């Protein structure tokens, strides 16, 4: 098999998904969780986007990136996943796959959380953009857009939950000085 930029991006996604899932065993048990019905909308939007990116490869090819552009997109995916992992390691056992709070939960505002409030979602946005641009398909662009909307929805849900659980004053001060997903974006 020849390693093309797109194949490299698929491998990066596979390695990230496997290691991310395995690392879930490291997370602390939640003391309180958001009701699942409140999470359902962002899950539907996000997983529809991911399905369009990886499982529905039909539709017109809008472009085929050059080898250099393809490898630059593979680099973007690599950096994006590294940003996700930096955030996950910074959170430690506070991380959870669903919107929840652990008994020892606190506001994390260091490392990548000093750059954006949701560095995992920011990294995933970069990774879905990389795969969509490398595929060059209309369905991929729609999938990436839906996934990004889903990540943004989950970020907003987490913020509402954390304001309630950790106190609005501290979280609002953090939100005033740190953009949600895009580094250096005006607040």
Give the residues covered by each predicted segment.
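Membrane-anchoring alpha-helices and their flanking helix-loop junctions
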Residues: 1-109, 127-187
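Histidine-centered phosphotransfer motif of kinases
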Residues: 110, 114-122
């Amino acid at each position: 098999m020849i390693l093309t930029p797109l194949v490299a991006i698929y491998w990066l996604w596979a390695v990230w998904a496997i290691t991310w899932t395995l690392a879930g065993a490291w997370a602390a048990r939640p003391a309180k969780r958001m009701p699942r019905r409140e999470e359902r909308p962002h899950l539907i939007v996000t997983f529809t986007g991911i399905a369009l990116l990886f499982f529905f490869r039909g539709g017109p090819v809008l472009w085929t990136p050059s080898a250099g552009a393809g490898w630059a997109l593979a680099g973007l995916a690599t950096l994006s996943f590294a940003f996700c992992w930096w955030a996950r390691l910074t959170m430690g056992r506070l991380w959870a796959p669903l919107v929840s709070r652990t008994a020892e939960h606190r506001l994390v505002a260091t490392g990548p959380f000093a750059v954006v409030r949701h560095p995992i979602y920011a990294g995933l946005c970069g990774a879905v953009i990389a795969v969509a641009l490398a595929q060059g398909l209309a369905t991929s662009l729609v999938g990436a857009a839906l996934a990004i909307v889903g990540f943004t929805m989950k970020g907003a849900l987490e913020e509402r939950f954390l304001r309630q659980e950790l106190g609005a004053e501290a979280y609002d001060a953090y939100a005033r000085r740190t953009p949600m997903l895009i580094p250096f974006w005006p607040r």
